[in-house]
A protein has these predicted regions:
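Short coil turns linking two alpha-helices in DNA-binding domains
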Residues: 30, 34-35, 82-84
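Short hydrophobic/aromatic patch on the recognition helix
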Residues: 38, 42, 86-87, 91
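Terminal helix-turn-helix DNA-binding modules in bacterial transcription factors
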Residues: 11-16, 21, 25, 44-82, ...
Length: 157
Protein backbone atom coordinates (compact mmCIF):
# COMPACT_ATOMS: atom_id res chain seq x y z
CA UNK A 1 0.00 0.00 0.00
CA UNK A 2 1.31 3.41 -0.96
CA UNK A 3 1.62 6.41 1.34
CA UNK A 4 -0.39 9.56 0.71
CA UNK A 5 1.56 11.93 -1.58
CA UNK A 6 0.30 15.09 0.14
CA UNK A 7 1.41 13.84 3.54
CA UNK A 8 4.77 12.77 2.08
CA UNK A 9 5.22 16.27 0.64
CA UNK A 10 4.31 17.84 3.99
CA UNK A 11 6.67 15.53 5.91
CA UNK A 12 9.53 16.31 3.53
CA UNK A 13 8.84 20.04 3.86
CA UNK A 14 8.72 19.83 7.65
CA UNK A 15 11.90 17.74 7.83
CA UNK A 16 13.79 20.19 5.59
CA UNK A 17 12.53 23.22 7.55
CA UNK A 18 12.34 21.73 11.05
CA UNK A 19 14.35 24.56 12.64
CA UNK A 20 12.17 27.29 11.11
CA UNK A 21 8.77 28.52 12.23
CA UNK A 22 6.13 26.31 10.56
CA UNK A 23 2.44 27.01 10.94
CA UNK A 24 -0.68 25.48 9.45
CA UNK A 25 -1.50 28.60 7.41
CA UNK A 26 1.84 28.45 5.60
CA UNK A 27 1.40 24.70 4.96
CA UNK A 28 -2.08 25.41 3.59
CA UNK A 29 -0.70 28.09 1.27
CA UNK A 30 2.26 26.00 0.11
CA UNK A 31 0.27 22.84 -0.64
CA UNK A 32 -3.05 24.45 -1.71
CA UNK A 33 -5.21 22.46 0.72
CA UNK A 34 -7.57 23.57 3.46
CA UNK A 35 -5.99 23.80 6.93
CA UNK A 36 -8.55 21.49 8.50
CA UNK A 37 -8.11 18.89 5.77
CA UNK A 38 -4.32 18.93 6.18
CA UNK A 39 -4.52 18.57 9.97
CA UNK A 40 -7.04 15.71 9.85
CA UNK A 41 -5.26 13.86 7.04
CA UNK A 42 -1.86 14.19 8.75
CA UNK A 43 -3.19 12.92 12.08
CA UNK A 44 -4.95 10.01 10.35
CA UNK A 45 -1.84 8.98 8.38
CA UNK A 46 0.91 9.62 10.96
CA UNK A 47 -0.97 9.17 14.23
CA UNK A 48 0.01 12.50 15.78
CA UNK A 49 -0.89 16.11 14.99
CA UNK A 50 1.40 18.18 12.77
CA UNK A 51 2.51 20.34 15.69
CA UNK A 52 3.07 17.35 17.94
CA UNK A 53 5.20 15.80 15.18
CA UNK A 54 7.22 19.01 14.75
CA UNK A 55 7.85 19.34 18.49
CA UNK A 56 8.72 15.66 18.88
CA UNK A 57 11.23 15.81 16.02
CA UNK A 58 12.81 19.01 17.35
CA UNK A 59 13.22 17.40 20.76
CA UNK A 60 14.45 14.13 19.21
CA UNK A 61 17.07 16.04 17.20
CA UNK A 62 18.18 17.93 20.31
CA UNK A 63 18.89 14.84 22.44
CA UNK A 64 22.30 14.10 20.93
CA UNK A 65 23.50 17.63 21.73
CA UNK A 66 23.38 17.01 25.48
CA UNK A 67 26.65 15.10 25.22
CA UNK A 68 28.48 18.06 23.69
CA UNK A 69 26.82 21.37 24.59
CA UNK A 70 27.04 22.65 28.15
CA UNK A 71 24.23 25.16 27.79
CA UNK A 72 20.63 24.04 27.52
CA UNK A 73 19.77 27.48 26.11
CA UNK A 74 22.08 26.82 23.13
CA UNK A 75 20.46 23.43 22.56
CA UNK A 76 17.02 25.04 22.64
CA UNK A 77 17.94 27.84 20.25
CA UNK A 78 19.79 25.50 17.87
CA UNK A 79 16.67 23.36 17.58
CA UNK A 80 14.20 26.08 16.65
CA UNK A 81 12.85 27.03 20.08
CA UNK A 82 12.65 30.73 20.89
CA UNK A 83 13.01 30.38 24.65
CA UNK A 84 14.47 27.97 27.17
CA UNK A 85 11.17 28.02 29.09
CA UNK A 86 9.13 26.77 26.14
CA UNK A 87 11.83 24.24 25.23
CA UNK A 88 11.87 22.92 28.80
CA UNK A 89 8.07 22.68 28.90
CA UNK A 90 7.89 20.73 25.61
CA UNK A 91 10.94 18.64 26.55
CA UNK A 92 9.40 17.52 29.86
CA UNK A 93 6.08 16.76 28.15
CA UNK A 94 7.78 14.57 25.52
CA UNK A 95 10.77 13.05 27.35
CA UNK A 96 9.19 12.83 30.81
CA UNK A 97 11.90 14.75 32.67
CA UNK A 98 13.25 18.28 32.34
CA UNK A 99 16.40 18.95 30.29
CA UNK A 100 18.62 19.15 33.39
CA UNK A 101 17.49 15.68 34.52
CA UNK A 102 18.06 14.39 30.99
CA UNK A 103 21.64 15.67 31.20
CA UNK A 104 22.01 13.64 34.40
CA UNK A 105 20.72 10.65 32.45
CA UNK A 106 23.25 11.18 29.65
CA UNK A 107 26.09 11.59 32.14
CA UNK A 108 24.93 8.58 34.21
CA UNK A 109 24.68 10.79 37.25
CA UNK A 110 23.49 9.70 40.69
CA UNK A 111 20.99 12.58 40.64
CA UNK A 112 18.46 10.71 38.51
CA UNK A 113 16.29 7.93 39.93
CA UNK A 114 15.76 4.50 38.41
CA UNK A 115 12.13 5.42 37.77
CA UNK A 116 13.17 8.56 35.88
CA UNK A 117 15.67 6.51 33.88
CA UNK A 118 12.88 4.10 32.87
CA UNK A 119 10.64 7.03 31.87
CA UNK A 120 13.40 8.58 29.74
CA UNK A 121 14.24 5.30 28.02
CA UNK A 122 10.56 4.60 27.28
CA UNK A 123 9.92 8.09 25.86
CA UNK A 124 13.13 8.21 23.81
CA UNK A 125 12.18 4.83 22.35
CA UNK A 126 8.78 6.28 21.37
CA UNK A 127 10.53 9.15 19.59
CA UNK A 128 12.79 6.71 17.80
CA UNK A 129 9.81 4.61 16.70
CA UNK A 130 8.05 7.72 15.33
CA UNK A 131 11.19 8.65 13.38
CA UNK A 132 11.45 5.13 11.93
CA UNK A 133 7.72 5.07 11.12
CA UNK A 134 7.98 8.34 9.17
CA UNK A 135 11.07 7.17 7.26
CA UNK A 136 9.27 3.97 6.25
CA UNK A 137 6.13 5.95 5.40
CA UNK A 138 8.17 8.12 3.03
CA UNK A 139 9.75 5.02 1.45
CA UNK A 140 6.26 3.74 0.54
CA UNK A 141 5.48 6.82 -1.50
CA UNK A 142 3.79 6.13 -4.84
CA UNK A 143 6.37 6.46 -7.60
CA UNK A 144 5.64 9.36 -9.90
CA UNK A 145 5.95 9.04 -13.62
CA UNK A 146 8.79 11.16 -14.82
CA UNK A 147 8.92 12.60 -18.25
CA UNK A 148 11.74 11.02 -20.15
CA UNK A 149 13.05 12.89 -23.12
CA UNK A 150 14.15 10.57 -25.89
CA UNK A 151 17.13 11.84 -27.79
CA UNK A 152 17.64 10.88 -31.39
CA UNK A 153 21.31 10.07 -31.79
CA UNK A 154 22.71 9.47 -35.24
CA UNK A 155 25.70 7.29 -35.92
CA UNK A 156 28.63 9.04 -37.47
CA UNK A 157 30.31 7.02 -40.19
Amino acid sequence: MYSNNLICDILEYINKNIYKEIDITSLSNIFYYDKTYIMKKFKKEIGVSIFDYINRMKIFNSLSLFQYDNYILNIALNNGFNSIEYYSEIFKKIVGVNPKKYRYFVNRSKYITDREIDIVIDNVNKLNRLDIFVKRYLERRRPTEKMVKVLGIKKIK
